[in-house]
Amino acid sequence: MTKNIHDVAYELQKAIAENDDFKTLKESYAAVQADAASKNLFDEFRTMQLSLQQKMMQGQEITEEDNQQAQEVVARIQQDAKITKLMETEQRLNVVIGDVNKIIMKPLEELYSAQQQA
């Protein structure tokens, strides 16, 4: 019997939510949100990050001023232990999710590589 792919996806969602890195991420995020200075700095970083992404998606040039502002925010973030822990944990979780994505995409990769060899 074939498994319903959506059921498998929900199982994966549950596994991610139960993952230790995800639990640590939630705790780290709560710690950032509970500290006014960390929260404001994190919000500033997210706003800057989204603004730069939007510019790139629209084909706009990232100016030297944009780069300088980004570097200044990143330098301040590196001084905040709560945000640093949050970002390190998020990075570890992103590696896991990237690995899962590679596994999920393997059948398509095999299909297309077999087509190219034919």
From Swiss-Prot:
InterPro entries: Com_YlbF, YheA/YmcA-like_dom_sf. Pfam families: Com_YlbF. Belongs to the UPF0342 family. HAMAP family: UPF0342. This is UPF0342 protein BCE_0953.
